[in-house]
Amino acid sequence: MGGLSAMQRRIDLLVEGGDEYDACSHFRSVVMWDKSLRPPLPRAEPRIRVLHDDVTVDRYGWLRDRENPDVRAYLEAENSYAEQATAHLRRLKTELIAEIEGRQPCEGATPPFQVGPFDYFQGHERGLPHPVWWRRPVTGGSAELVLDPNAIPGADVFYWLGVFEPSDDGRYLAFSVDLIGAERYELRVRDMSDGRDVWRDAGSVGQVVWAADNHTLFFTRERPDRRQHHQIVRLNVGRGNSEVVFEEANERLAVLVRRSQSGAWLFLDVLTTSDMSSYVQRGAAEVWCLPADEPGGQWRRIVMRELGHQIYAEHWYDRFLFRVDDAGPYWRLVSAPIDDPSPSRWEEVVPHRAGVTIDEIHVLEQHLVLLEREGLRPRLISRNRSGRVGAVIVPDEPSCTIRVGLSAGGCYSAARHPFRSSKLTYSVSSFVTPDTFIEHDFANDRSVVLCEARVPGYDATQYLATVVMAEAEDGVQVPISLVARRDRTSPGPVLLSVYGCYGIPRLPSFLAWPSSMTARLSLLDREVAFGIVHVRGGGELGRPWHDAATRDQKRITHTDLISATEGLIERGFATRDGVVIEGKSGGGGTVLATAVFRPNLFRAVVAEVPLADIIDTQLDSTMPYTLKETAEYGDPQDAYEYRYLRSYDPYYNLSPERSLPPTYVDAALDDGQVIYYQPARYVAQRRSCATDRDPDLVFRIRMVGGHSGPSHGPGIAEQAAFRMAWVLDQLRSHAPPPSRKARSAARRSTDPVR
């Protein structure tokens, strides 16, 4: 009884507004550039939760009701405050927007890709928000319009492409669009002979694949409450009828449908929702197959989920290829006869090698090509049908990204390459190398550059990229990919980016406009270096790198970031008061949590659509990604894991006694991954827990668009310019870019880390 009485007194104190509550509830005036500005603070509606004898109060849970007019009023007030608080940066923001928009590459930044008798390609007419899709016969002739997103009602506000999949004969086009930003894609099938849309599926659709008959389409449909695909639907376009042919009942599993690179087989993968290690070729717990020319047939299970392995299947001649993790986390490659691919018939093709991850399998008629990664360096290795190693392609970059094949670029579009060929197209991209598309002929081991993104005004020789190592608390070496101008003065300001979640590898990439590096050139030109810290929890160094920082080891992600920052300062690359950390989504949660542990180490924090409250996400059964988050962070229903989460959860570590660095937070009203009220609650609670330090806190919420941000140029440039102007202001780096000032040759260096 005594314990209950004490707990009740704590609850009464929190609800009634005793001393503890008063300390957190007073609204403060942020000392920014205009001291008369006062940020908004929504009303508090305290709700008590008692879990594992821990009493917490959620004062701003009511913000989740987006239909409440007070919610929108508060969000609009935050946007207004953000504009006023950064009013002194308007000229800088305008300058940055002009720089970013001026780097839009010329046409032809991506080569066309072939499907059947046609080459498909994009054309971007200036003045229109979205590129238009065309096609031209492979044999030559005039181009014809296939898809103009600018003509879709609502696309002028927001438009995101999900899939773009033409049938092999060129009759039909399956494409999907998101016109809100919530990542729920509507499927449409267009008859390209007359331009009519002959089918629509308003449900949330993912992958699509055509059967060999060119009128049967298979696609995945999403489970509404879990945001994962659980159904495979077969559509007969000619008849206009559809039926569910496979449904996964286990909500911890999802399904995916695809076609083998040979074109002969369809594969149905059953995936664990917690496995996000690769967006391109994810391992499956179970695999089914169906001949592509028998779309009405019965699917055959070739990998049993009872095996407990992760497997990716491909087809090559009379055998199936399996990338499997049975021998270790870096994968090995085996083959098996099509009629009996059971494990007893597996024959090893490539053994498991510690430290060498087999990321992807690609097959040509006479060549097997593997995309491997050792450390941060990817490579392509070919083998002929007898298993002899042929070409080995290793880009001359310290760390970079290789993408194999060509696709339409939609989030569910599959990259493709011709099977009956000895040539394979791939792209290389890094901090200093814009996307460069290369065709390699494995018959004669020769390469030719097809095209490269030409960024106006960009001179790659002015920048230098490198990789340095930092020693973590436990002695592990953590890599940091860095880029800076060659003539940058060291030490200097640095923007460090981090993700560190779900085993997703984040490697340097330039990407074509509009993208992060084309925008970040404006930072580099103002002598702010940029880097990615490859902390544990990510997948850059393979699955063990991820597994080392999950659940009750998750704080290793944060301590790795701290060690990397300290290492750059000790090496004389970064100034002690000149490091800004940034992260997006799960990475946003990473930087917010890390700032709790070492607030004085960082000049400022940028948290885009951050996972700011892990505990409440896990406890809310209506949240779409709860199961995935549990596998990564732990289950707060377990007392031990709850206490561990409580030790670093950004929201629950806000207090009046803790000062935090200046922070920029953004969110999106229609975000389907990190629901807007997570960042909003964090900001409101942090404002209410102001300390004497009064750290500057800016919060912007996009009323249009979702997790990935605006969908076309002006919005993307404005968002990037606002964020970078804020970062430059925190670093006091208002210096103009080098085109407007003389640079001393005496400052030139060959190594950005001295």
Curated annotation (Swiss-Prot):
Family per record: Belongs to the peptidase S9A family.
An annotated GO BP: proteolysis
EC number(s) given by UniProt: 3.4.21.-
Pfam families hit by this protein: Peptidase_S9 (PF00326), Peptidase_S9_N (PF02897)
Keywords, in A-Z order: Hydrolase, Plasmid, Protease, Serine protease
Region of interest called Disordered, as start-end residue ranges on this chain: 733-754
Organism: Sinorhizobium fredii (strain NBRC 101917 / NGR234)
GO MF term set: serine-type endopeptidase activity
Record protein name field: Uncharacterized peptidase y4qF
InterPro entries per record: AB_hydrolase_fold, Pept_S9A_N, Peptidase_S9_cat, Peptidase_S9A, Serine_Peptidase_S9A
Active site: S585, H707
Listed Gene3D superfamilies: alpha/beta hydrolase (3.40.50.1820), Prolyl oligopeptidase, N-terminal domain (2.130.10.120)
PANTHER family for this protein: PROLYL ENDOPEPTIDASE-LIKE, PROTEASE FAMILY S9A OLIGOPEPTIDASE
